[in-house]
Amino acid sequence: MLFSPPLQRATLIQRYKRFLADVITPDGTTLTLHCPNTGAMTGCATPGDTVWYSTSENTKRKYPHTWELTETQSGAFICVNTLRANQLTKEAIQENRLPALAGYNILNSEVKYGAERSRIDFMLQADFRPDCYIEVKSVTLAEKENGYFPDAITERGQKHLRELMGVAAAGHRAVVVFAVLHSAITRFSPARHIDIKYAQLLSEAQNKGVEVLAYKAELSATKMELNEPVPITL
């Protein structure tokens, strides 16, 4: 994924009201950015960090600038736009960069499924193969080199795991992909210290046939690409 037009650089003043952030540009202008992230963003929004933002051509948007990346004061890159996790995963599947998800010729997005009336991020299909249901989660919480999900209690995430267990029980392929969008992370675990229920459900899901995968993205201010498998400890 290439950023076109190129991202612009600023310095973070503060994030507030979950969806807004104030930054100051190199010429001293103060801007308010849209922050497309509902999580705690722990370690991703420290005042003084470098922010890389995109600008929409939609003149009707109240906040035309979108916070895409954080470049921390220690030099790590973090993609804070959670929408990018799905985009990167879709691109990687279509370009056959994820061998575990190769071999399908149809990819559908936001398909309704499950007893709890959810929407799956992706459903892959191919002749003579079971349908493959994929839920994608963005991983940005880092403690040293360890990456964790979630960064806050997520009842929605718990629901998705229950739905995937139902998919596996019905004979389909069920997969949860953790997209690691933090350059300092080298391994992944569920955040038991934040959401013990989610961690327990993830282990249960794996035991009941749900595949758990984690891939890391190469991140820069010019492009992003999901391709590197990350070790998982449940």
Swiss-Prot record:
Record flagged with keyword DNA-binding: yes
NCBIfam families: sfsA
Reported function: Binds to DNA non-specifically. Could be a regulatory factor involved in maltose metabolism.
Alphabetical list of InterPro entries matching this protein: SfsA, SfsA_C, SfsA_N
Gene that this sequence comes from: sfsA
Keyword Signal: no
Top-rank taxon, per record: Bacteria
DNA-binding region(s) from the entry: 201-220
Record-annotated membrane-spanning stretches: none
Listed name of the protein: Sugar fermentation stimulation protein A
Entry keywords, A to Z: DNA-binding
Pfam families found in the cross-reference section: SfsA, SfsA_N
An MF annotation (GO) of this entry: DNA binding
Protein family per UniProt: Belongs to the SfsA family.
